[in-house]
């Protein structure tokens, strides 16, 4: 069946800028709805490609696409990713000086940007509202849309500014909302508070089959952590701690054991946080030890494990953080190390939280009740003898088998081997040297461009190159993630490295 013209154009742009020949999951459904002028809500797991759903329409629609995003680091990473894909974008947040902010607005008026990321707090300022009323806005995309819900794990009152902002625009744009973690109650809140009009709703499922979940209750957490990390010494991983103090202790523990680690929490100077994040993204350190301040917007595909050294406050936070493992589709492990003190720490944070307290004592009491209910669900996860994957999916309202056969609890019961899909095999020994060469070339490009290596080519793309050894442009363009733009910018150099390696091996043989 012949594709309709807008979707055909969308697919061409997907290939040109991102190097993929077809859409995944609900991407096509949501993009088609947005292009037809329909509001949309996408509930898609981490790594499912939510940003594609508004970036591709953003390139096709006549006006500007505004993306409402909650964190400065998230916006900056997204704009860097656009740049790597050959797309001009900008962000408007408090990291800009007033002069830089005015210049960005002026450039936007001149049509230099198709996609602009903006903080929700910015929507209520008169200067930004005047700007928004003076330019054509075709689409407003809301990232991390669960932040609008008081039932969510990360309620942000500033997200309540979005619907009034859209209502004051001269012409109502298409409104699209996206999140990775939303229970049925949170979905209803998103629909209500954002005032989505007859939206296309796509819930693609929360199941990440490549993730292996396990809960341990060790008598010695430090020893358990060291044993686990030692087993994954050559792999990238994240260790989440509930407090800054624990981040410091765990970082010191790992370093004293000869493991390269960086730390990240809100109490550090911005420069140290940035240096640590960069070192992790560039694979200069293997382990990032962090509070929940780290992770949102960090587009690192090859994280092989996530360890929670402390139990999080709720399932939403746990699954979002655990979901930062295995974004390249390869097998990855999500380990939670439970201790009785974790509950007391979580209770302390809930009792002392100020989020959502603007409504007075009654609102505070209601918010705390919600948070304590969520904490109970989190504790139940740690103590269930049933399937961990089923527990997670059931929490988010998704049907699943009572046993997945491939989590810590199921394996303990059934003693079966993992049967996880592995779309791209990791390089065998014969390809390992070529793979390491390609990683070195990628790092050179990344450092010169000031981009994380994964934005040049993902590990999966490099693995595919090492396995298939493309010998010409046509072969290179068959590699997932090699777009025409990226081939011109980087691919020719990678091709020469592969060809030289092949010639050298032929000479030896």
Identify the function of each model-found stretch.
Residues 1-2, 116, 504-509:
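Intrinsically disordered, low-complexity N-terminal extensions of nucleic-acid-metabolism proteins
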Residues 3-4, 8-17, 21-25, 29-51, ...:
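Helicase motor core with emphasis on the C-terminal RecA-like subdomain
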Residues 285, 302-307, 311-320, 325-450:
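C-terminal accessory region of SF2 helicases/translocases
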Residues 407-418, 492-505:
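Long, highly charged low-complexity segments enriched in Glu/Asp and Lys/Arg with interspersed Ser/Thr
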Residues 445-449, 463, 502-509:
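C-terminal extensions
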Residues 448-460, 465-494:
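Helix-hairpin-helix
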């Amino acid at each position: 069946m012949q594709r309709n013209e807008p979707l055909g154009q969308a697919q061409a742009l997907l290939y040109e800028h991102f190097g993929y020949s077809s859409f995944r999951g609900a991407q096509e459904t949501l993009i088609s709805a947005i292009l037809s002028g329909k509001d949309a809500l996408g509930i898609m797991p981490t790594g499912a490609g939510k940003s594609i759903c508004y970036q591709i329409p953003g390139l096709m629609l006549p006006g500007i696409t505004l993306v409402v995003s909650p964190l400065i680091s998230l916006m900056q990473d997204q704009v860097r990713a656009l740049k790597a894909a050959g797309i001009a974008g900008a962000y408007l947040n408090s990291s800009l000086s007033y002069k830089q902010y005015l210049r960005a607005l002026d450039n936007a008026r001149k049509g230099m940007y198709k996609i602009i990321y903006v903080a929700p707090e910015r929507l209520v300022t008169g200067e930004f509202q005047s700007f928004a009323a003076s330019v054509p806005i075709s689409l407003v995309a809301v990232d991390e849309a669960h932040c609008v819900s008081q039932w969510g794990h990360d309620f942000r009152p500033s997200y309540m500014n979005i619907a009034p902002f859209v209502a004051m625009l001269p012409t109502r744009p298409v409104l699209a909302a996206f999140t990775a973690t939303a229970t049925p109650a949170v979905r209803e809140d998103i629909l209500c508070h954002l005032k989505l009009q007859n939206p296309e709703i796509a819930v693609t499922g929360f199941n990440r089959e490549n993730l292996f979940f396990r809960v341990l209750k060790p008598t010695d957490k430090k020893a358990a952590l060291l044993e686990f990390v030692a087993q994954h010494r050559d792999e990238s991983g994240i260790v989440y701690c509930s407090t800054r103090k624990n981040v410091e202790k765990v970082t010191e523990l790992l370093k004293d054991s000869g493991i390269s680690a960086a730390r990240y929490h809100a109490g550090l100077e911005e420069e140290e946080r940035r240096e640590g994040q960069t070192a992790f993204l560039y694979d200069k350190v293997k382990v990032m030890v962090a509070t929940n301040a780290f992770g949102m917007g960090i587009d690192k595909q090859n994280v092989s494990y996530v360890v929670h050294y402390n139990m999080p406050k709720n399932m939403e936070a746990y699954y979002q953080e655990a979901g930062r493992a295995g974004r390249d589709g390869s097998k990855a492990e999500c380990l939670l190390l439970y201790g009785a003190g974790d509950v007391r720490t979580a209770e302390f944070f809930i009792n002392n939280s100020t989020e959502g307290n603007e409504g007075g004592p009654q609102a505070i009491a209601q918010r705390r009740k919600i948070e304590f209910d969520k904490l109970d669900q989190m504790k139940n996860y740690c103590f269930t003898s049933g399937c961990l994957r089923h527990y997670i999916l059931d929490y988010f309202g998704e049907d699943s088998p009572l046993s997945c056969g491939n989590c810590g609890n199921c394996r303990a019961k059934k003693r079966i081997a993992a049967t996880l899909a592995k779309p791209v095999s990791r390089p065998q020994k014969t390809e390992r040297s070529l793979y390491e060469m390609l990683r070195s070339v990628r790092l050179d490009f990344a450092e010169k461009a000031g981009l994380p290596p994964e934005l040049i080519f993902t590990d999966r793309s490099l693995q595919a190159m090492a396995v298939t050894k493309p010998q010409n442009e046509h072969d290179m363009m068959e590699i997932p993630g090699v777009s025409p733009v990226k081939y011109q910018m980087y691919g020719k150099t990678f091709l020469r490295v592969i060809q030289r390696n092949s010639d050298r091996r032929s000479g030896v043989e």
